[in-house]
């Protein structure tokens, strides 16, 4: 095997009350990565969405950091070239950096037949997130590897729970800049016990809803975060307006990750109406898609 091409999905993290825990893999948008064996070293090329803003230096690129660590740990002596085609806009709130991290970890596991488990791939993938977010975290890379719905319940040791789900979502991507760093810095360092009780209760209810195929309950609780979303809503112009306009057309709506992407669980009969509202307010791309699989191989040479 000389080269492998993989698809790595966009993801939505938090989903309301599941801050830094819940994650959902999307069928679209997605990145494609090609990893090819070379004689020595690691080289990176990027095209697609905002490619000009993405560093190709190994230590400054999320995929490069993951690849370097894996190759050191497994004493891989050959080199590799990583080509990333960005289908997921960086800074969108749809796990763009995570797709690169997860995609390269998955590709290296295939290319060099390392035999790593999905949990081990999540662990390596999360290391690359430190480049984008300042610290390793797994709420996006976990669904990118596992697919479906994931819960990252512990980091020491790393524990990820996976629930296969069949849900359709409608995602808006406003053309608004939201810094992940800023979106984290504005969050409270302490919260009232009542807010904790609310969020734990709603998060638990979402899991119950998944196991009972209750979209209405899942969406209603997804919309009830009282800690993170209220802080971040002001970073996304028009969000409160949109939330009010679509409230009877969706089972649930919330900010995807740190934003600006907005994720909804739409009522099927209102999908077109919701899309029109998104476009009227934000004039932005909209994705109507299913919850998707994790990374998968598209081509092998």
UniProtKB/Swiss-Prot annotation:
Its EC number is 2.7.1.39. Pathway: Amino-acid biosynthesis; L-threonine biosynthesis; L-threonine from L-aspartate: step 4/5. GO terms for biological process: threonine biosynthetic process. It comes from the Archaea. GO terms for cellular component: cytoplasm. Disulfide bonds: none annotated. ATP binds at residues 89-99. Coiled coil: none annotated. This is Homoserine kinase.
């Amino acid at each position: 095997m000389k080269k492998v091409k993989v698809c790595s999905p966009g993801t939505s993290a938090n989903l309301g009350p599941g801050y830094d825990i819940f994650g959902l893999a999307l069928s679209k948008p997605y990145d494609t990565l090609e990893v090819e064996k070379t004689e020595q070293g690691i080289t990176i090329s990027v095209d697609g969405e905002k490619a000009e803003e993405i560093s190709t230096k190994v230590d400054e690129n999320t995929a490069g950091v993951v690849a370097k660590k894996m190759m050191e740990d497994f004493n891989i002596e050959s080199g590799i070239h990583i080509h990333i085609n960005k289908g997921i806009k960086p800074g969108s709130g749809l796990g763009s950096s995570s797709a690169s991290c997860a995609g390269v970890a998955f590709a290296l596991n295939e290319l060099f037949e390392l035999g790593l488990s999905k949990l081990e791939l999540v662990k390596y993938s999360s290391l690359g997130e430190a480049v984008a977010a300042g610290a390793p975290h797994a709420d996006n890379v976990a669904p990118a590897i596992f697919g479906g719905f994931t819960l990252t319940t512990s980091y020491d040791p790393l524990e990820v729970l996976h629930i296969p789900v069949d849900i359709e979502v409608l995602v808006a991507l406003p053309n608004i800049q939201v810094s992940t760093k800023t979106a984290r810095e504005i969050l409270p360092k302490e919260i009232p016990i009542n807010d904790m009780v609310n969020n734990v209760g709603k998060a638990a209810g979402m899991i119950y809803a998944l196991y009972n195929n209750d979209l209405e309950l899942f969406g209603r609780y997804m919309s009830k975060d009282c800690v993170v979303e209220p802080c971040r809503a002001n970073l996304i112009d028009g969000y409160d307006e949109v939330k009010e306009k679509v409230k009877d057309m969706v089972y649930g709506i919330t900010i995807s990750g740190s934003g600006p992407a907005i994720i909804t669980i739409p009522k099927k009969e209102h999908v077109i109406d919701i899309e029109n509202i998104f476009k009227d307010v934000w004039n932005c791309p909209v994705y109507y898609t299913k919850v998707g699989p994790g990374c998968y191989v598209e081509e092998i040479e």
